[in-house]
A protein has these predicted regions:
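P-loop NTPase switch/coupling surface
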Residues: 1-141
Length: 141
């Protein structure tokens, strides 16, 4: 079950974007009591979420970012060049050293037996730059 998903510099998204399925600690929980579950390891997780926005607001690119991340796991193929998905607003043609061509992803999931995994990956035009997987048994929001 996905708890948090963050990505940066993907297609139309320049800044870091975060999508969370964790129930907020606010009045919203009282208004929608049937829309979250509590798990033994400490997290309160929303049952449903909706992504809304205006036309050309990035909803499709958000879903494409998940598809791109899924490619690393499902296809298990060598990373190709993905120049067309890096946010081109971060490329300074006059000074390549200042280019921000790095895509970053972070996803937190709740797996079986109450174990929380966090996977982070950074890629650029050439391939994977950095990758990390860690886990914990208790979740603190």
């Amino acid at each position: 079950m996905v708890l948090n998903y963050k990505f940066e510099n993907f297609m139309s998204f320049r800044e870091k974007v975060e999508f969370s399925m964790l129930a907020p600690k606010s009045k919203v929980k009282k208004r929608f009591e049937d829309n979250f579950i509590s798990v033994d390891s400490g997290a309160e997780i929303l049952k449903t979420a909706v992504i809304v926005g205006e036309n050309a607001g990035g909803k499709s690119n958000f879903v494409r970012s998940l598809d791109f991340l899924k490619m690393y796991f499902k296809d298990n193929e060598h990373v190709r060049t993905y120049k067309n998905i890096v946010n081109s607003n971060n490329i300074k043609k006059d000074c390549p050293k200042e280019d921000n061509t790095k895509l970053s992803y972070e996803i937190e999931v709740l797996a079986e037996k109450g174990i929380y995994y966090r996977y982070c990956i950074e890629t650029d035009f050439l391939g994977v730059l950095n990758e990390k997987l860690d886990y914990k048994t208790q979740y603190s929001q």
